[in-house]
Swiss-Prot record:
One of its GO terms (biological process) is biotin biosynthetic process. The record marks Y25 as: Participates in the substrate recognition with KAPA and in a stacking interaction with the adenine ring of SAM. This is Adenosylmethionine-8-amino-7-oxononanoate aminotransferase. The gene is bioA. Disruption phenotype: Cells lacking this gene are shown to be highly attenuated in a mouse tuberculosis model. Pathway: Cofactor biosynthesis; biotin biosynthesis; 7,8-diaminononanoate from 8-amino-7-oxononanoate (SAM route): step 1/1. It comes from Mycobacterium tuberculosis (strain ATCC 25618 / H37Rv). It comes from the Bacteria. Catalyzes the reversible transfer of the alpha-amino group from S-adenosyl-L-methionine (SAM) to 7-keto-8-aminopelargonic acid (KAPA) to form 7,8-diaminopelargonic acid (DAPA). It is the only aminotransferase known to utilize SAM as an amino donor. Can also use sinefungin but not S-adenosylhomocysteine as substrate. PANTHER family: ADENOSYLMETHIONINE-8-AMINO-7-OXONONANOATE AMINOTRANSFERASE.
């Protein structure tokens, strides 16, 4: 069967893929599950090729948490094509342009108070690198170059570049292979789901021991994403803000996965009503169209860095502030803000909660949890993709479980019936996990 894939048949695509392409977190030559060929994406649906035939499946992953408006939204398509006719790309060194200015102003307006300066980069991982670089340069500008370590709590994930890996969970995360060569950071115990003042007190005591060498505390607020899809009480963020201020340590929020409404607040920090010194956003920023991220910081951070010995923030991506990415990001954010997104997320949360409830009785299930438009089934053993993927496809859903987690972060446009279809597939996958030895 030929498809709209540049002349290659699905069989040819798989052959080229197997010979030449490396996929995320995969091996070459011994992949247990071959990739599925995607040929189209519209709304909340993907068109995949299975057994030589096209099938329509729901994108329950929002294509790794990016496509909050679904695929091919007319407003985003128009923004991209309009900008393409004017200017596809220019270097950002020495030049500026309207899409970057509009997006920067929009982000400053909607993010927590005080984040007045924006640095654009190519990806979430790079935005974390930039945030860490900001923190280190800030303290050098303050005449305290010894403040160069970072502190976080266990269970987090912040990206795949080297500094970002150093603040991912050192043992349970995806980067334990590199523990002996990564920068040695300070790790507090896993943050509990429910609020416990004793945890905050212990965190403060540990931070106090290292305050003289700490540049910043870095955390994912409310939801720890790829490190385990764990949720925690927003009051911990309020405590972190107070602790960091008292001990003169910067506070960095990684909102790459949580930003733009996913948790039920526009940004997860809003649940606690606190502002970090530095914040990273990405993923849903462009609505899933292009790769773009941003690192925002306070005027104090920006001016201190600029007044330091280097006289500049020493970072500059080639595709920084790409006009196409900025233009579609403006359209995506304005589309979100122009609708009753809070009600939409509340409805999605209700649908996920109701649909996943039956999973609680399954023998392999240890927890079921929902936060905004995030639904998670945690199992007592790893999920076998060779079993999970076809089972979900049988039910018209694209899922991508990892470790012992079956989860969904669906597009905000999903109907109640589509959410029911997604949760039914998740429950079936969890049931199969329990039926295997």
């Amino acid at each position: 069967m030929a498809a709209a894939t540049g002349g290659l048949t699905p069989e040819q695509i798989i052959a080229v893929d197997g010979a030449h392409l490396w996929h995320p977190y995969s091996s070459i030559g011994r992949e247990a599950v071959s990739p599925v060929v995607a040929v189209a994406a519209h709304g909340a649906w993907l068109t995949l090729i299975r057994d030589g035939q096209p099938i329509e499946v729901l994108d329950a992953m929002s294509s790794w948490w990016t496509a909050i408006h679904g695929h091919g939204h007319p407003a985003l398509d128009q923004a991209l094509t309009t900008q393409l006719r004017v200017m596809n790309h220019v270097m950002f060194g020495g030049l500026t342009h309207e899409p970057a200015a509009r997006l920067a102003k929009l982000l400053v307006d909607i993010t927590p108070a005080g984040l007045d300066t924006v640095f654009f980069s190519d990806s979430g991982s790079v935005s974390v690198e930039v945030a860490a670089k900001m923190a280190l340069q800030y303290w050098r500008g303050r005449g305290l170059p010894g403040k160069r370590r970072l502190m976080t709590w266990r269970g987090g994930y912040h990206g795949d570049t080297f500094l970002a890996m150093s603040i991912c969970d050192p043992h349970g995360g995806m980067h334990s292979l590199w523990t002996d060569v990564l920068a040695a950071q300070v790790f507090a115990p896993q943050v509990p789901r429910d609020y416990d003042p004793a945890y905050s007190a212990a965190f403060e005591a540990q931070l106090a021991q290292h305050a003289g060498e700490l540049a910043a505390v870095v955390v994912e607020p409310v939801v720890q994403g790829a490190g385990g899809m764990r949720f925690h009480d927003p009051r911990y963020l309020h405590d972190l803000r107070d602790i960091c201020r008292r001990y003169e340590v910067l506070l960095i929020f990684d909102e790459i996965a949580t930003g733009f409404g996913r948790t039920g607040a526009l940004f997860a920090a809003d649940h606690a009503g606190v502002s970090p010194d530095i914040m990273c956003v990405g993923k849903a920023l462009t609505g899933g169209y292009l790769s773009l991220a941003a690192t925002l910081c306070t005027a104090d951070v920006a001016h201190t860095i600029s007044a330091g010995a280097a006289g500049a923030l020493m970072h500059g991506p080639t595709f920084m502030a790409n006009p196409l990415a900025c233009a579609v990001s403006v359209a995506s954010v304005e589309l979100l803000l122009g609708q009753d997104w809070r009600t939409r997320i509340t409805e999605l949360a209700a649908g996920l909660t109701a649909g996943l409830d039956t999973a609680r009785a399954l023998p392999a299930v240890t927890d079921v949890r929902v936060c905004g438009a995030i639904g998670v089934i945690e199992c007592d053993r790893p999920v076998d993709l060779a079993v999970a993927t076809p089972a979900a496809l049988d039910r018209g859903v694209w899922l991508r479980p990892f470790r012992n987690l079956v989860y969904a972060m669906p597009p905000y446009i999903c109907t109640p019936a589509e959410i029911t279809q997604i949760t039914s597939a998740m429950v079936e996958v969890a049931r199969l996990v329990g039926s295997l030895p």
